[in-house]
Swiss-Prot record:
Gene3D superfamilies: Viral capsid, core domain supefamily, Hepatitis B virus. Belongs to the orthohepadnavirus core antigen family. Keywords: Capsid protein, Cytoplasmic inwards viral transport, DNA-binding, Host cytoplasm, Host-virus interaction, Microtubular inwards viral transport, Phosphoprotein, Repeat, RNA-binding, T=4 icosahedral capsid protein, Viral penetration into host nucleus, Virion, Virus entry into host cell. Homodimerizes, then multimerizes. Interacts with cytosol exposed regions of viral L glycoprotein present in the reticulum-to-Golgi compartment. Interacts with human FLNB. Phosphorylated form interacts with host importin alpha; this interaction depends on the exposure of the NLS, which itself depends upon genome maturation and/or phosphorylation of the capsid protein. Interacts with host NUP153. A motif (Bipartite nuclear localization signal) lies at residues 158-175. This is Capsid protein. One of its GO terms (biological process) is microtubule-dependent intracellular transport of viral material towards nucleus. InterPro entries: Hepatitis_core, Viral_capsid_core_dom_sf_HBV. One of its GO terms (molecular function) is structural molecule activity. The modification Phosphoserine is found at S155, S162, S170. Transmembrane segments: none annotated. SUPFAM superfamilies: Hepatitis B viral capsid (hbcag) (SSF47852). Sequence repeats lie at residues 155-161, 162-169, 170-177.
Length: 183
C-alpha cells in the first residue's frame, strides 16, 4: 500500500521532502511545543480538528517506537546490531516523526493554507538554480494568526440581542420537520 499521511491535508511526502532533514527540530523540542501550545486540545476526549487527531497519532507512534527501541536496547546482545537498529530508527523513523509533528503543529499554529503555500514556495526556491534564486529561502511567518479551537456543539444562548440587530427585525424561526421526514 502506498499511504501518504499528508494527503488529506493537501500536502504530500514529496512536498515535505524538499525541506532538508536538519530543518526539522528535534522530536523532544516538537513534543514540548505541542504540549505547551495544544495540551488541552490533545488531551481532550472531544474531537477538535483532523490536525489534532493526526498530532495525537504521531505522538502515540513515537511513544510506541521508543518502547520498541528500549526493548531492543535491553534484549539485543550484539552491540553492533543494537547500534544499527538505533541508528536506523533515529535516521529514518525519527525523521518521519519529526516531519509529521512539524507539519501538524505548523498547520495548527499558522493555518494549513499558509503551511502549504510555504512548502510550495520553498520547493520552488530549492529547485531553482542558485544563480537565479534569491539568496534567502522563504520563511514561514513568525507572526501567526491567532488559532482558535472551537468545540463542536451548540453555542450558549445570548441573553441580550446583538447590538447590530434592529429591534424591528423578528428573529428567524426554525422550520419544524414533519414526522414523515424524521428517521
Amino acid at each position: 500500500m502506498d499511504i501518504d499521511p499528508y494527503k488529506e491535508f493537501g500536502a504530500s511526502v514529496e512536498l515535505l521532502s524538499f525541506l532538508p532533514s536538519d530543518f526539522f527540530p528535534s522530536v523532544r523540542d516538537l513534543l514540548d511545543t505541542a504540549s505547551a501550545l495544544y495540551r488541552d486540545a490533545l488531551e481532550s476526549p472531544e474531537h477538535c480538528t483532523p490536525n489534532h487527531t493526526a498530532l495525537r497519532q504521531a505522538i502515540l507512534c513515537w511513544g510506541e517506537l521508543m518502547t520498541l527501541a528500549s526493548w531492543v536496547g535491553n534484549n539485543l546482545e550484539d552491540p553492533a546490531a543494537r547500534d544499527l537498529v538505533v541508528n536506523y530508527v533515529n535516521t529514518n523513523m525519527g525523521l518521519k516523526i519529526r516531519q509529521l509533528l512539524w507539519f501538524h503543529i505548523s498547520c495548527l499554529t499558522f493555518g494549513r493554507e499558509t503551511v502549504l503555500e510555504y512548502l510550495v514556495s520553498f520547493g520552488v526556491w530549492i529547485r531553482t538554480p542558485p544563480a537565479y534564486r534569491p539568496p534567502n529561502a522563504p520563511i514561514l511567518s513568525t507572526l501567526p494568526e491567532t488559532t482558535v479551537v472551537r468545540r463542536r456543539g451548540r453555542s450558549p444562548r445570548r441573553r441580550t440581542p446583538s447590538p447590530r440587530r434592529r429591534r424591528s427585525q423578528s428573529p428567524r424561526r426554525r422550520r419544524s420537520q414533519s414526522p414523515a421526514s424524521q428517521c
